[in-house]
């Protein structure tokens, strides 16, 4: 297994078919997301010595490109939480009812009205972030000597969120009204942490950023990686944490 940083925001991880077989994985496992796919991504990230600027990212997206003798996993980190004041999202109204286009237009207009030209410029970068990451994948593949048959790229996104108490975790879970591929709940000291995996298949390029912004209305940006949580925290719910917490009624 090899890792190469191809840009400030994107890593390329190459995994041979032999490595896949050793992990009990097959190419078909990536076509239909399941628990073993989730664990595969997490285990790969746990084993690698990630660059410092990737270790504290609250959002990582995964895109898998199968090849004849290997798979290439492209990992892209988002800077959304560092460049936008997400507390101001409350001023935009109920963004859960907005289309992606309306969300970005409303956010852009809000920034312009407040004279936040720097954030406005950054928004344009964020809106194109996933498209640029895809282009990096294409350029990397084109640069290889042996042309290979074009295959569909499979994408996932991984989040980590922080919460001050269990009540906040339950409230967050009850706001989720879209499919979650996998979720876990951890306790570390006095705080709680949740990991979430989403499938990006058949979604627009800005879907990951939109979902991240929606969830940050009810959660804090993650300050720990899943690898850290698994080693230093108590895992309260191992899988399907969101749906299990949604069953709790709060007075």
Swiss-Prot record:
MF terms in GO: protein-macromolecule adaptor activity
Coiled coil: none
Gene3D superfamilies on file: 3.30.70.1950
Recorded superkingdom: Bacteria
Assembly description: Homodimer.
Role description: Enables the recognition and targeting of unfolded and aggregated proteins to the ClpC protease or to other proteins involved in proteolysis.
Domain comment in the entry: The N-terminal domain probably binds unfolded/aggregated proteins; the C-terminal domain interacts with ClpC.
Family, as annotated: Belongs to the MecA family.
The protein, known as: Adapter protein MecA
Organism phylogeny: Bacteria, Bacillati, Bacillota, Bacilli, Lactobacillales
């Amino acid at each position: 297994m090899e890792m190469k940083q191809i840009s400030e925001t994107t890593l390329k991880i190459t995994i041979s078919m032999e490595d896949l077989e050793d992990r009990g994985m097959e190419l078909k496992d990536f076509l239909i997301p399941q628990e073993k796919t989730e664990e595969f991504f997490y285990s790969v990230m746990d084993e690698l010595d990630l660059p410092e600027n990737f270790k504290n990212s609250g959002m990582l997206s995964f895109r898998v490109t199968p090849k004849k003798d290997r798979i290439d996993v492209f990992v892209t980190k988002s800077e959304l939480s560092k460049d936008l004041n997400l507390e101001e999202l409350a001023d935009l109204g109920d963004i859960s009812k907005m289309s992606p286009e309306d969300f970005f237009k409303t956010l852009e207009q809000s920034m312009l009205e407040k004279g936040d030209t720097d954030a406005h410029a950054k928004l344009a970068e964020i809106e194109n972030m996933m498209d640029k990451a895809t282009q990096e994948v294409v350029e990397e593949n084109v640069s290889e000597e042996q042309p290979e048959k074009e295959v569909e790229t499979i994408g996932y996104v991984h989040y980590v969120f922080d919460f001050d108490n269990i009540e906040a975790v339950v409230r967050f879970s009850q706001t989720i009204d879209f499919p979650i591929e996998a979720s876990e709940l951890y306790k570390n000291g006095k705080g709680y942490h949740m990991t979430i995996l989403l499938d990006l298949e058949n979604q627009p390029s800005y879907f990951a950023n939109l979902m991240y912004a929606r969830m940050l209305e009810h959660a804090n940006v993650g300050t720990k990686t899943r690898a850290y949580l698994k080693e230093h925290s108590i895992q309260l719910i191992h899988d399907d944490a969101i749906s299990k917490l949604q069953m709790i009624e709060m007075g």
